[in-house]
């Protein structure tokens, strides 16, 4: 598998500029380059002035978004795995682990003596547990044993369409806490914190990495990745066709194994709690 060739910008460019000032054009040719998350199709280059010219349609190529880029930003030439493709694979993996893996969050409300049913956030998938803040100095949160989660609540009365009804005798005015599972959220920004944004535990990071890896490798056979380099013919005699598919299957097996392990750990951390309900 060849190493991506790189250079850098020597001047800022805005989202509509077609002339790129580069640190080196020795590896540049007509084709695609990547700057940050943007793909750009280059139509020509000038070795004397170390510039490259994008085609009129070249900015924001292959579904990326044209953006401004600053001096010294890395320019990757014909990237094997474009950043946008990697990000999509990561987010596809995050979405695919649900419901085996799920995010956990909490919501609270104050109990009213005349009210038994309360609105819940629309993001709730299932209620994992309910507790309430008991009076006095003990600081104990007592489990609520009688409650009902309604996923099909009347939307005219409850905007989110989800409610919980509490039937235990709880001191009015006390805080009730609902712990619930939800679908993991995808990553959006480059500086997003995995645990904070997705809601998944930090130990699940490698599950997402394996999931993204097998998705990317499934479409590219590493035994044929060197077709753009001078040693292509020699490499083809040493690396059997299909090695990419084999690598993808291996990573898929690792993904499935780690997914099962993390799912078991999550079930152990949040076991099904017995409670009374009404129908």
Range-by-range predicted roles:
Residues 57:
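Arg/Lys-rich RNA-binding interfaces used to dock onto structured RNA substrates
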Residues 17-23, 61-62:
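Short alpha-helix capping/helix-loop boundary micro-motifs
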Residues 1-14, 27-53, 65-279:
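Glycine-enriched, solvent-exposed interface loops adjoining structured elements
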């Amino acid at each position: 598998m060849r190493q991506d060739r790189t250079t850098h910008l020597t001047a800022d460019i805005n989202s509509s500029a077609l002339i790129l000032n580069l640190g080196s054009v020795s590896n540049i040719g007509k084709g695609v380059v990547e700057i940050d998350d943007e793909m750009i199709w280059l139509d020509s280059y000038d070795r004397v002035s170390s510039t490259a010219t994008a085609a009129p349609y070249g900015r924001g190529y292959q579904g990326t978004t044209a953006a401004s880029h600053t001096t010294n930003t890395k320019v990757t030439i014909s990237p094997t795995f474009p950043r946008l493709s990697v990000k999509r694979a990561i987010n596809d993996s995050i979405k695919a682990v649900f419901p085996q893996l799920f995010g956990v969050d909490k919501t609270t409300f104050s109990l009213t003596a005349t009210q038994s049913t309360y609105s819940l956030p629309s993001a709730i998938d299932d209620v994992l547990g309910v507790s309430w803040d008991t009076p006095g100095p003990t600081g104990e949160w007592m489990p609520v044993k009688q409650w009902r989660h309604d996923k099909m609540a009347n939307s005219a009365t409850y905007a989110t369409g989800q409610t919980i009804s509490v039937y235990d005798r709880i001191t009015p005015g006390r805080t009730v806490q609902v712990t619930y599972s939800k679908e993991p959220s995808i990553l959006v920004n480059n500086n997003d914190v995995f645990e904070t944004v997705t809601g998944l535990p930090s130990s699940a990071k490698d599950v997402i990495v394996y999931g993204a890896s097998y998705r990317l490798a499934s479409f590219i056979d590493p035994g044929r990745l060197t077709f753009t380099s001078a040693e292509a013919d020699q490499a083809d005699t040493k690396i059997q066709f299909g090695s990419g598919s084999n690598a993808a299957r291996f990573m898929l097996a690792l993904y499935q194994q780690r997914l099962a392990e993390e799912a078991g750990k999550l079930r152990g951390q949040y076991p099904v709690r017995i409670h009374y309900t009404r129908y």
